[in-house]
């Protein structure tokens, strides 16, 4: 539905409501105008869709969905990404991982291991680091060190904290270590 809309269709809540009339999916999903704008931007403005996924079979399904809809997909967590790393690399999908995750928390993460960042880096996947959203977020730097201790290159770990993030989210004024850029 959102892929059939134009800029004019999403210019106001009234226009969105008019455009939604007759679309059963919009009614079934109880979409609000703000939801339609978000979907429109996702499909038409190349905004990244971040999906928290762990199981290798689910990652492969998401790759199919990415191809079908032309989505700018980013995988989050992706503890079994190592099992399908070639497919992820082939489709140029960045991955956000927690470098401290090294054992399975569920049956969706049975292939979880401490070397995942190094393994993904080896096949050219843009790796980014994240940490559990707690007061310990500052430990992300230590996580980068753990990734290096377990096979990731120093350069890859720095890029996982800086330029890979900037490139994956189309941020042009920061995140790259270069003269004239903001260094946060």
Residue spans for each PLM region:
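Short acidic active-site motifs
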Residues: 38, 83-84, 116
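Amphipathic coiled-coil/heptad-repeat helices and related helical stalk/stem segments
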Residues: 35, 55-58, 81, 112-113, ...
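His/Asp/Glu-enriched, well-ordered alpha-helical/loop segment
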Residues: 48, 89, 98-102, 106-184
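Catalytic beta/alpha-barrel core
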Residues: 50-54, 72-80, 100-106
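Polyanionic/metal-chelating signatures
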Residues: 1-73
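Glycine-enriched alpha-helix->loop->beta-strand junction motifs that scaffold or abut catalytic
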Residues: 66-73, 89-96, 124-126
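Active-site-adjacent beta->alpha loops and helix N-cap segments on the catalytic face
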Residues: 80-90
